[in-house]
Amino acid sequence: MAESFSFDVVSDFDRQELVNTLDQVKREISQRYDLKGTDTSVELDKENIFIITNSELTLNAVNDIIRQKAIKRNLSLKIFDYGETEMVSGNRIKQTILLKQGIKQEIAKKISKNIRDQIKKINVSINGETLRVASKSKNDLQLAIKLVSELEESLNIPLKANNFR
């Protein structure tokens, strides 16, 4: 029997699910009557989604479609950080949506401190953009997982517990 049990706290998303979501969004934009002829484009690069369209109304409709499709594909809406809209050539509007991935150092420290304050017999180590939570008791780890899910709401970042060993 193992002497110590552990799990990792990560903040990431399934990139293929995001690609599939944006494919569905593009398909709906091309088929919806109110969005036809708006010359709307949705592009994905490594860290951002770019939406270029004709009007604020169309931009809001596209953002709603992205949210709906992301929820259906089990993507957390917390991965989207909506940027400001800006005017580009030809009276068009561009919005950049930053994709949140990884746990920043200061947030990792907050999570670590919070877990240690609540559960005494637990070890939390920060490994780059992940946290490793270890304990000799599975019950303590289950409490830590519950605590992480509660912290997810207050920190406004998507957190997952994985690699439970």
From Swiss-Prot:
UniProt KW Repeat keyword: no
Family annotation (Pfam families): DUF520
Gene Ontology MF: a single term: nucleotide binding
InterPro entries from the UniProt entry: DUF520, UPF0234-like_C, UPF0234_N, YajQ-like_sf
This protein's UniProt keywords: Nucleotide-binding
CC annotations in GO: cytosol
Entry similarity comment: Belongs to the YajQ family.
Function: Nucleotide-binding protein.
Protein name: Nucleotide-binding protein A9601_05361
Organism: Prochlorococcus marinus (strain AS9601)
